[in-house]
Design a protein with these regions (language model features):
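N-terminal intrinsically disordered, cationic/polar leader segments
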Residues: 2-76, 80-95
């Protein structure tokens, strides 16, 4: 019986490979949904409402916002995302 080799662990940092043509998307609203397997973050842009849209919103109790992008991440990714957001928020708040 031969000894099985342990998988070699490699530590590395992932850096975004910035592509100057990659679109930058602005959003000021995020809706979140999840399944047992992933989280979906739907980013929208809410613009100031016209008088007509205000009346519709008052009647329907709904404001429609255009979806700019949807991002789906695995459940295992979410704790790291939360930790990164909290750290960046702490640095932002302390400055």
């Amino acid at each position: 019986m031969s000894d099985q080799q342990q998988p070699k662990q490699i530590n590395f940092t992932i850096l975004p490979d910035e592509d100057s043509t990659a679109p930058r998307t602005y959003a000021n609203f995020c809706s979140i949904a999840h399944t047992p397997f992933d989280f979906t973050l739907t980013f929208c842009e809410v613009m100031p409402l016209s008088d007509k849209e205000i009346k519709e919103a008052e009647a329907e109790h709904v404001v429609r916002a255009p979806v700019r992008t949807k991002i789906v991440v695995p459940v295992q990714f979410v704790p790291n995302l939360i930790a990164a957001l909290q750290e960046h928020w702490r640095v932002f708040s302390d400055s």
